[in-house]
Amino acid sequence: MKADTPTDKASVLVVMGVSGSGKSTIAAMLAHRLHWLYEDGDWFHPKKNIEKMHHGEPLNDEDRWPWLHAIADWIDATRHSGNHGIVACSALKRSYRQILIGDRRDVRLVYLKGDQDLIERRVAARADHFMPPALLDSQFAALEEPTADERPITILVAPHPREIVETIVKKLNIDEPVGSSADRAPR
């Protein structure tokens, strides 16, 4: 992957965290607030990954590589089309984030950080998600919190989602929504 021209302005955000941290909710609300494109990383999972998780089996790295590369392709398509976008993706390990962000200086990481007890309660309350609460322990075990060199925007998940979104917008130093020229970038 070749390095891009450094910039402080994000063109794509990767909203990361364990299952139940609020990635999809926050990313969708943030995309609406900024008028940016939105994709949920779950939409990129091949059927076999979804079936595996539905049966309570944690994914391994071999399951994740094609999924991560599909998301990285969306990130590049969004950037190269001149749009701005947000993708919700667990991105638990540094090696996963390297695939998604790498040397792309205009792709920023938003880390939704939360206490395991709070997140367990959230996951237990969800009825319509393919990932069962039993897999949450494996997500926390796999989590490698982002380090300063990854330039994360770290946000605690306890506040109301609207408050979280406004905090992210302030930390990004975005005065006005940039907007996007399309509803969704090509996959």
What are these model-predicted stretches?
Residues 15:
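Hydrophobic anchor at the beta1->P-loop junction of P-loop NTPases
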Residues 1-11:
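Extreme N-terminal, non-catalytic leader segments
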Residues 62-104, 112:
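Glycine-rich phosphate-binding loop used to anchor ATP phosphates in small-molecule kinases
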Residues 18:
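P-loop (Walker A) phosphate-binding loop of NTP-binding proteins
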Residues 125-167:
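Small-molecule kinase domains that catalyze NTP-dependent phosphoryl transfer to phosphate-bearing small molecules
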Residues 23:
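Conserved lysine of the Walker
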